[in-house]
Regions:
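Conserved AMP-binding/adenylation subdomain of ANL enzymes
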Residues: 310-330, 338-379, 394-395
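Conserved C-terminal "lid"/linker of ANL adenylate-forming enzymes
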Residues: 233, 595-601, 610-612, 630-710
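Conserved AMP-binding A3 loop
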Residues: 121-129, 280-282, 289-313
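Conserved AMP-binding/adenylate-forming
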Residues: 321, 408-410, 417-554, 562-564, ...
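Structural core segment of the AMP-binding/adenylate-forming
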Residues: 172-267, 384-385, 390
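Conserved AMP-binding/adenylate-forming core of the ANL superfamily
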Residues: 39-44, 93, 109-168, 185-190, ...
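AMP-binding/adenylate-forming catalytic core of the ANL superfamily
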Residues: 155, 180-206, 220, 374, ...
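Adenylate-forming
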Residues: 158, 200-219, 241, 336, ...
Length: 710
């Protein structure tokens, strides 16, 4: 330990009893190697990729046929996107439901949602056996509707039981799932469905958020008439009772809507088939399983297709081997169906744990998640860094108000977790738990920098690089020096490509133009690969620390790599600023949200750091607050980090998944047209125009006469 090492905040009581340590011992013995530390194991897993992932398959008892070795071409670069387990056959849903046979009465899913004064459904507990039956029924409905391997099934609605059943039934047939959250605007949904042309749409009649009913049915006519190929069948789920609100009556909608293209069904009718056990169509490891859309802000959303086998074995690596989640655990990840954390959550079923679903606002009543944790004995709670920050401001004394008796891990993602919030969690929520800041994202539908139960937690750092991923920064072995996050070796959760995939994956692809397939694959290559070595570029700016306690190096994420700031040659990420300001002291001063970007000056040779600040209603950015911001940044970082301008704005633009958009706003304030930003990808596109005006004014004041970015 050196004086610059961050404080160790937690350490496992019994690291050798963790799954990762046991697997390392098994590998050491089997391969005659000595893997004494996590770092040894991580290095071995990166150097022996076929063997490592094959060991994960065996250790996890994956149901299916692994096929013979070799399991991957070890010489292939990430850019070659090699096929993994080329002869394997497996089914994702079969593996998620595999615990039903031995433990039919275990609770598989607890389905909960936000209440209103006139809508208070009790939590639904669904046993393993019941879940299998529900999937069999939904599968029968899908078969009757003609759904087959490779067809797309889309879901639009809340994170409720029927969404999970739809996902499981879709994948049981080898069909491809895609989902949009209930709060996605209809334009965003049109843009997604138009790209993937689903055969079947399952849609909720509405949901509750912020104690209000949000009906979706009124949006359906616009959706259907806008799609060039409306789904042949649409199934409507009564998540809100008909009588709640006359705008949401499913009966009226079913009677009133006849467009002749899509056939409407009630969920209850669609699944009206005998329960029993579904059939499982085993497909190839590299066959598509679901399509996620990236929250890119220019152009159409990227339709990222993930591979079946990778999604299965990597989730087991993540949840069981590195997270020690297993039967008896209750896993609650706060998510909507529009975020990749949805798949991350449902994949917890394969461990035998109970998965808790909650649909609604996590903060309208800030006690909500903590009440669920107490009421249902949640042991693993996943949330976002933003949520933890908000809780620290609006409901700080969680640990005094809640027992949190079984809680042993809190996972945080979505954006980097500031060091102060590590302190907050350990001081105000619970001391004896693993606080895992984790990072990955839509592009890989998983986590590749994250938690490991065998390792300590250091303040402000992600614990480790996950097994099987040769993560590095472009500053390479010069650890502690920030650089771009890259993956140096191929990995099995690399997406198959963007939709539409090459024809070998398209059973019904005869109507897809080759030019569209080629354009999608070219966009895929362009999105992630930019050097001759064929490394994967993830788009993050990161610092990987020296290894401590054998942890393979901790990671500090510093913002999107293309949002890197560089005033007077000092490179730093927006997170360096956010981590100072995301602090209850600033919330108390009225700061709600901030965004940092660079304004190019000196012909583009230099830039000035601009901090946009949104204040809570009725609060103004006064001189005292400005002074506090500057002095805090100066003392926490350096004088070079102090923004050249601090500007109050009415809103900070956010993607549908709640991410700030530094890169497009940087372009806008430097003169690029706002039309390049796709408004359907934002929660609050109306605020963009304000940034156009601010950009013009700032450029005029800085004497920038010609816009420097297009
Ligand atoms: C795991 C993640 O990285 C989640 C996200 O930020 O989208």
């Amino acid at each position: 330990m050196t004086s610059t090492d961050p404080e160790q905040l937690w350490a496992p009581a019994n690291p050798e009893s963790t799954q990762s340590a046991k697997l390392a011992a098994h590998v050491s013995q089997k391969y005659g190697v000595q893997l004494s530390t996590y770092e040894d194991f991580w290095r071995w897993s990166c150097a022996n990729r076929g063997d490592f992932w094959s060991e994960v398959w065996d250790w996890e008892g994956v149901i299916g046929d692994k096929g013979p070795a070799p399991y991957v071409d070890e010489s292939a670069r990430p850019k070659d996107n090699p096929k993994w387990f080329p002869n394997a056959r497996l089914n994702w849903a079969e593996n998620q439901l595999r615990n039903a046979a031995a433990h039919p009465a275990d609770v598989a899913i607890i389905d909960t949602c936000e209440h209103t004064s006139d809508f208070k459904p009790a939590p639904r507990e669904v046993s393993q056996k019941e879940l299998v039956g529900l999937v069999a029924q939904a599968q029968a409905g899908m078969k009757a509707a003609g759904v087959q391997k490779g067809h797309r099934v889309a879901y639009w609605g809340g994170n409720r039981l029927e969404a999970a059943v739809t996902l499981l039934a879709t994948t049981s047939l080898g069909a491809i799932f895609s989902s949009a959250a209930a709060d996605f605007g209809v334009d965003g949904v049109i843009e997604r469905l138009e790209q993937i042309k689903p055969h079947l749409l399952v849609v909720s009649n509405g949901c509750v958020y912020n104690q209000k009913h949000h009906p979706l049915l009124p949006l359906l006519p616009r959706l259907f008439t806008s799609l060039s190929h409306p789904p042949a069948n649409t199934v409507i789920i009564n998540h809100l009772p008909d009588e709640l609100d006359d705008k949401v009556s499913v009966s009226q909608f079913l009677e009133g809507w006849h467009d002749g293209h899509t056939k409407l069904h009630r969920w209850a009718d669609f699944v009206n088939h005998p329960a029993g056990v579904p059939t499982y169509e085993r497909i190839g490891f590299n066959d598509p399983i679901w399509i996620l859309f990236s929250s890119g802000t220019t152009g159409k959303p990227k339709a990222i297709v993930h591979r079946c086998g990778g999604m299965l074995i990597d989730a087991l690596r993540e949840h069981h081997i590195q997270g020690d989640i297993s039967r008896g655990d209750v896993f609650f990840q706060y998510t909507t169906t529009g975020w990749m954390m949805y798949q991350y959550l449902i994949a917890g079923l394969a461990t035998g744990a109970t998965v808790l679903l909650y649909d609604g606002s996590p903060l309208k009543d800030p006690a909500t998640c903590w009440n669920l944790i107490d009421a249902h004995g949640v042991s693993i709670f996943g949330t976002s860094a933003k949520y933890i920050e908000m809780v620290s401001k609006v409901y700080p004394d969680v640990g005094k108000k809640h027992a949190l008796a079984r809680l042993r891990q809190i996972l945080s993602t979505g954006s980097p977790l500031a060091a102060d919030l590590f302190d907050y969690v350990y001081a105000n929520i619970k001391q004896d738990l693993l606080l895992g800041s984790v990072s990955g994202g839509t592009d890989i539908c998983s986590v590749f920098a994250g938690r490991c139960t065998a390792l300590p937690v250091y303040r402000g750092e992600i614990q480790c690089r996950q097994l099987g991923f040769y993560l590095d920064s472009t500053s390479s072995d010069a650890h502690e020096i920030p650089g771009e996050l890259i993956v140096r070796e191929a990995f099995p959760i690399e997406p198959v490509g963007f939709w539409p995939l090459p024809r070998e994956y398209l059973p019904d692809g005869q109507n897809i133009a080759q030019a569209d397939i080629d354009a999608a694959q070219a966009r895929f290559l362009d999105s992630y690969f930019k050097d001759d070595a064929g490394n994967w570029y993830h788009g993050d700016f990161v610092k990987i620390t020296r290894s401590r306690a054998g942890n393979s190096g901790g990671l500090v994420f510093l913002g999107r790599s293309d949002g890197v700031l560089n005033p007077q040659g000092i490179r730093f990420g927006p997170m360096d600023i956010y981590s100072v300001l995301e602090n209850p002291a600033f919330a108390a001063r009225g700061i709600e949200e901030t965004l940092v970007v660079g304004l190019l000056v000196d012909g583009g040779n230099d830039e000035k750091v601009i901090l946009f600040v949104k204040m809570y209603d009725g609060k103004a950015l006064d001189d005292e607050c400005l002074k506090l911001i500057k002095t805090s940044i100066r003392s926490a970082r350096s004088a070079r980090h102090v923004p050249a301008r601090i500007v109050q704005v009415s809103d900070i633009p956010m993607t549908l998944t709640g991410k700030k958009i530094e890169v497009p706003i940087r372009k806008v304030i430097n003169g690029a047209p706002v039309a390049a930003i796709n408004p359907a990808t934002l929660r609050n596109p109306a605020c963009l125009q304000e940034y156009v005006g601010l950009g013009e004014a700032m450029r005029a004041e800085e004497g920038v006469l010609v816009p420097l970015l297009q």
